[in-house]
């Protein structure tokens, strides 16, 4: 029996990954991390979607220690989300160490479940400048997990080379465009669905949706080319 663990935030990307995983694996589990993020609605959205999609299990893990260590606009209510980069060239929504911690814990959870695959929705094509969304980082983490636990743990990144329009196309391919559009939470200001329309996450999400809806045939063709027409 094939098993997978999806790192699941309830946002567009991880929800699309979860929907795809349900077509690829016999047993799909999700893990959501409560790190004291700016909006707790994210946790509730993830719970609701996990229930609606009828996955094998959904674990919510308290990692509030990350909030103590990582100062970011996503972990502090008194730091407004900025469209400008910080002095180090990163957006102020970057949470240092977040994906290092998330992938490590998801790998440990997969080990306990007897799962060989951990799926994460990080993307290098349309990424927001986060260094822990790069393929190079994910491959390094995969090597570390395999060596550290003496077990093959595959870190799968279905969206890594897709742009946001192609990610919308992927959701549509699995007949879930409306679900992802209306029920997921990507907005940095905690507004479900279309979001606030002003934060960087909303801009990227809406631009991708507009691009997909205005150029459906070409975007779907591009998606198929990148995925070689496979569902896996």
Swiss-Prot record:
Residues binding ATP: 8-18
EC number, UniProt record: 6.3.4.20
Keyword Nuclease tagged: no
UniProt pathway: Purine metabolism; 7-cyano-7-deazaguanine biosynthesis
Recorded GO MF terms: ATP binding; ligase activity, forming carbon-nitrogen bonds; zinc ion binding
Binding-site list for Zn(2+): 187, 196, 199, 202
Keyword Iron-sulfur carried by entry: no
Catalysed reactions, semicolon-separated: 7-carboxy-7-deazaguanine + NH4(+) + ATP = 7-cyano-7-deazaguanine + ADP + phosphate + H2O + H(+)
Cofactor(s) of this protein: Zn(2+)
GO biological process: queuosine biosynthetic process
UniProt-listed SUPFAM superfamilies: Adenine nucleotide alpha hydrolases-like
The record's free-text note on cofactor binding: Binds 1 zinc ion per subunit.
UniProt keyword annotations, A-Z: ATP-binding, Ligase, Metal-binding, Nucleotide-binding, Queuosine biosynthesis, Zinc
Domain of life: Bacteria
Segments forming a coiled coil: none
InterPro entries, per database record: QueC (IPR018317), Rossmann-like_a/b/a_fold (IPR014729)
Stated family: Belongs to the QueC family.
Function recorded in the entry: Catalyzes the ATP-dependent conversion of 7-carboxy-7-deazaguanine (CDG) to 7-cyano-7-deazaguanine (preQ(0)).
HAMAP family: QueC
Alphabetical list of PANTHER family matching this protein: 7-CYANO-7-DEAZAGUANINE SYNTHASE
Record-given protein name: 7-cyano-7-deazaguanine synthase
